């Protein structure tokens, strides 16, 4: 949990907007945590009203070009409004490290941020693999020195919310991870 709390504290002071990119269990669990913790209008609240936590959007759960274009316009607007200090965190989650929808959405988002000179950093959440035979996503993370979190071997998508797949989102919006785990353990 220490690394997750460090991520939480870092994001509260350095990140304006998080875009969580995933599909299936890599999306749904995080989206439920966000909805439970934040509600529908979180992104409309001021930084103070969000207790310093960043805005959060989701992408990669489909191949809808209009949705992605709208998200990019939103990020561009926010960057123009805040100025050069605006910073985005892309959280790309893929168990296999190569799922088409999130990887394609991630590449489009990254290119859009680069083209618009918007500051960003990347966090990768992917299957545990050794550095000798990494998933495509883990190889990208190693090459680019991104923060990484792991999906344990054998954990299916619907249960991944109880791993760093869900916990990264939870940390980034101030969700009580320890309480969540205690509740799950009591069932």
Predicted regions and their residues:
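Extended, charged alpha/beta regions that create polyanion-binding interfaces
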Residues: 1-9
């Amino acid at each position: 949990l220490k690394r997750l709390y460090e991520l939480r504290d870092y994001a509260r002071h350095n990140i304006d907007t998080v875009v969580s990119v995933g599909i299936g269990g890599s999306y749904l669990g995080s989206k439920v945590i966000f909805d439970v913790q934040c509600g529908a209008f979180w992104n409309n609240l001021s930084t103070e009203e969000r207790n310093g936590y960043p805005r959060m959007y989701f992408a990669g759960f489909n191949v809808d070009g209009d949705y992605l274009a709208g998200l990019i316009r939103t990020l561009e607007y926010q960057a123009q409004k805040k100025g050069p200090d605006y910073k985005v965190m892309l959280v790309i989650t893929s168990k296999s490290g190569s799922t088409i929808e999130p990887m394609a959405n991630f590449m489009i988002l990254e290119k859009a941020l680069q083209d618009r000179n918007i500051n960003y950093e990347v966090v990768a959440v992917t299957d545990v693999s050794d550095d000798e035979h990494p998933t495509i996503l883990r190889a990208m993370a190693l090459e680019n020195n991104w923060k990484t979190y792991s999906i344990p071997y054998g954990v299916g998508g619907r249960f991944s919310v109880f791993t760093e797949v869900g916990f990264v989102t939870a940390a980034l919006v101030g969700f009580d991870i320890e309480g969540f785990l205690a509740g799950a353990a009591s069932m």
